Amino acid sequence: MKTLYSLRRFYPVETLFNGTLALAGRDQETTGFAWWAGNARLINLSGKLLGAHVAHAGLIVFWAGAMNLFEVAHFVPEKPMYEQGLILLPHLATLGWGVGPGGEVVDTFPYFVSGVLHLISSAVLGFGGIYHALLGPETLEESFPFFGYVWKDRNKMTTILGIHLILLGLGAFLLVFKALYFGGVYDTWAPGGGDVRRITNLTLSPSIIFGYLLKSPFGGEGWIVSVDDLEDIIGGHVWLGSICILGGIWHILTKPFAWARRAFVWSGEAYLSYSLGALSVFGFIACCFVWFNNTAYPSEFYGPTGPEASQAQAFTFLVRDQRLGANVGSAQGPTGLGKYLMRSPTGEIIFGGETMRFWDLRAPWLEPLRGPNGLDLSRLKKDIQPWQERRSAEYMTHAPLGSLNSVGGVATEINAVNYVSPRSWLATSHFVLGFFFFVGHLWHAGRARAAAAGFEKGIDRDFEPVLFMTPLN
């Protein structure tokens, strides 16, 4: 049966050149969308849309498992993770699997298990996706009303939202349980250079947890990205998990209020735009987190942050020149400021030279040398440990700088090595994805609002100016 043209006129339709590509219920004639419009053809086919999403999840999980095993197969335990271009194993190591003191990998078997579990899961999801895409019912409303839905049904939509929030909350609690009861997580701040430990003293004070949200995003404040101890991170996940679960229950039990019914557009494309907007925000936050934060993303696995590599260089040369007899407390640099040490705008003693701009840095290899007024001169003279020297020399030569052709390091460095920090990869990719998702959010929000208002933006093809122009030849 052909859909009435009046029901299809709100969709800009491209002509399908090859009419033989039609699939029953999924062709241009019935849906108003050509084959390349992807899931738009399935807007009103909940069963087929389920298949598309399950299959997509299968592809994602397959990538995770395959890439995980690829990284395990190429992993060299003697080299730091960040020197090997790894982006998945650092996450597993951060969760405390397979690592010991100082972030040294002692066992790769947990990484292998993770990869295999993801591959098996992807097979299950792949089978489910193919089943629902090809064999299962086209729509779920008749046979499985609990899983069926109509996009305009506001109550059902908020119920689905609630279920998703509960699942997200449970995900947050998985991290909490891992940190509290199942072996702990890697703490880069553990004495002597980092270790896996169980978190025993959670931060649950709302003034501390929500204080992060009220901080300025700039400079030494750094909003939530400034978190620098695991108690706060795990405590934050307790709060977040609880809020998500309670919010989920609320959305399942209630119907949207009148103001919410008026404020939102209630259509599939509108929900897509809201989701893309949220994911865009997540992408930008993740970008800042992986670039600046060395607690949630320990430098032992991801390499140093930019400020950390810079401060490490200043520290390394302070150590060298102090051994050669320099008085690091009073030596003057070429600008008349301190060559090795100077004062920050608020009076603390900080590293001098170009790295002064990064005086906010906190890092586990440096903090033991601070006193109440910044860097402590007597500690710098007497208390520097070999592990601190080794780590700063390592970080100094592995700054998160690099180009697309994988030649890492400062652009003017003639001895550049084949190194690009995982921080560079993860921060850049999440920024780019966040940007594209934001553009997608604007695109789909505009279309959804236009459809709700009863018109589509675009040129009326019947009166297109080009049709009245003389042919060029």
Curated annotation (Swiss-Prot):
A Pfam short name: PSII
Gene Ontology process terms (BP): photosynthetic electron transport in photosystem II
Modification sites for N-acetylthreonine: 15
Compartment list: Plastid, Chloroplast thylakoid membrane
Superkingdom field: Eukaryota
Coiled-coil segments: none
Cofactor binding summary note: Binds multiple chlorophylls and provides some of the ligands for the Ca-4Mn-5O cluster of the oxygen-evolving complex. It may also provide a ligand for a Cl- that is required for oxygen evolution. PSII binds additional chlorophylls, carotenoids and specific lipids.
Transmembrane residue ranges: 69-93, 134-155, 178-200, 255-275, 291-312, 447-471
Modified sites of kind Phosphothreonine: 15
UniProt propeptide residues: 1-14
GO cellular component, one term: chloroplast thylakoid membrane
Membrane topology value: Multi-pass membrane protein
Keywords of the record: Acetylation, Chlorophyll, Chloroplast, Chromophore, Manganese, Membrane, Metal-binding, Phosphoprotein, Photosynthesis, Photosystem II, Plastid, Thylakoid, Transmembrane, Transmembrane helix
Function description: One of the components of the core complex of photosystem II (PSII). It binds chlorophyll and helps catalyze the primary light-induced photochemical processes of PSII. PSII is a light-driven water:plastoquinone oxidoreductase, using light energy to abstract electrons from H(2)O, generating O(2) and a proton gradient subsequently used for ATP formation.
Subunit structure: PSII is composed of 1 copy each of membrane proteins PsbA, PsbB, PsbC, PsbD, PsbE, PsbF, PsbH, PsbI, PsbJ, PsbK, PsbL, PsbM, PsbT, PsbX, PsbY, PsbZ, Psb30/Ycf12, at least 3 peripheral proteins of the oxygen-evolving complex and a large number of cofactors. It forms dimeric complexes.
Full protein name: Photosystem II CP43 reaction center protein
